[in-house]
C-alpha cells in the first residue's frame, strides 16, 4: 500500500543531457489559448521560465485568445486570489518578467475580441501592433530560436 510521501516513479534518473543556451540563443513561446482553458497556459509558462533559466533570451507572445492570459485579475479586487491557484498564470507571467523575460500581447485581440484596453495588462507586458505578431515569429525563426507554439481550439 502506498502512503503520502512515497515516490511512484524514479525522479532521480535523467535520460537526456541538461542543455544550456549558448550566448545569444533565443526562445519564443506563443500562446493562442484562453487563460485557464486546460493546462497549456500553466505548463508552457513554466517551460518558458525554464528556457529563460537555461540562458535563452526568452519571449512570450500572447495573441488571439492568448491575450486573456495577460489581463490583471482578482476577486473581489484586482490582485486578490479568490481561491488557491486563481492567479497562478498571472503570478507565472510576473515572475517570468522579473527574471528578464519579455511578454508581448496583441492590441487587436485586446480591443477587438475582448473589449479591453492596454491598461488591463499585468504591468510589464508590452502591447504590440497586430502586424508585429507575424514579425515577432519571423524574427525568432530567422534567429534559429527554439519556438513552442501553444494552441487550443
Which sequence ranges carry the predicted segments?
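Positively charged, low-complexity intrinsically disordered leader regions
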Residues: 2-23
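Short, glycine-rich nucleotide/cofactor-binding loops
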Residues: 23, 27-42
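Histidine-anchored nucleotide/phosphate-binding helix
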Residues: 40-60
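Short internal beta-strands
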Residues: 57-64, 103-107
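A glycine-rich helix N-cap at a beta->alpha junction
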Residues: 78-112
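A short aromatic-anchored loop/beta-hairpin motif
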Residues: 96-99, 104, 113-114, 120-141
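Glycine-rich, aromatic-bearing surface loops/beta-hairpins
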Residues: 137, 142-153
Amino acid at each position: 500500500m502506498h502512503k503520502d510521501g512515497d515516490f511512484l516513479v524514479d525522479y532521480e534518473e535523467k535520460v537526456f543531457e541538461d542543455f544550456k543556451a549558448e550566448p545569444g540563443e533565443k526562445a519564443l513561446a506563443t500562446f493562442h489559448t484562453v487563460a485557464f482553458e486546460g493546462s497549456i497556459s500553466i505548463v508552457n509558462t513554466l517551460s518558458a521560465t525554464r528556457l529563460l533559466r537555461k540562458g535563452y533570451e526568452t519571449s512570450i507572445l500572447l495573441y488571439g485568445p492568448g491575450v486573456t492570459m495577460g489581463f490583471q485579475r482578482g476577486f473581489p479586487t484586482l490582485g486578490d486570489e479568490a481561491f488557491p491557484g486563481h492567479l497562478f498564470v498571472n503570478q507565472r507571467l510576473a515572475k517570468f518578467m522579473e527574471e528578464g523575460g519579455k511578454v508581448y500581447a496583441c492590441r487587436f485581440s485586446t480591443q477587438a475580441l475582448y473589449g479591453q484596453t492596454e491598461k488591463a495588462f499585468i504591468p510589464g507586458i508590452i502591447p504590440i501592433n497586430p502586424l508585429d505578431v507575424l514579425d515577432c515569429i519571423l524574427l525568432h525563426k530567422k534567429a534559429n530560436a527554439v519556438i513552442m507554439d501553444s494552441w487550443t481550439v
